[in-house]
């Protein structure tokens, strides 16, 4: 799998990357290869997720979406919206069910949209907070996706935060029969 951060609006993609992706789509058809486009937070993207729209347009089993939970929070904070209000405008449940293949799962502790290693993509502080975020993603049809913890560490030698995040996520999955 190839994960690609994509900073294009659909109007730009149609003029640039879509012709290339259409060729790649033909080459990859019938293979297990996936190109996974990750959402990023763009100022132009207030009410639609461009990478979901891109994958809807391409309509290929080989080209899917990765939703990064931290990017959702950063974008909501930039627009001064709570996460539920933002997701209601940004994500379409049916499109998510069809197009989201993978989730980058971690916590964001700041409320300004700024990426700081100490506050962005960190371990959830507790099981309740993790459950809240996981429930949001499941509500939008993403429970059957690949969930990848993506945690910044204080100490990359021990990976203690990552291990704790995986433990809490495993408890959530077991409790909710996912």
Give residue ranges: language-model regions.
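Active-site acidic/histidine proton-transfer and metal-coordination neighborhood
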Residues: 1-64
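Histidine-acidic metal/acid-base catalytic patches
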Residues: 19, 55, 60-67, 73-178
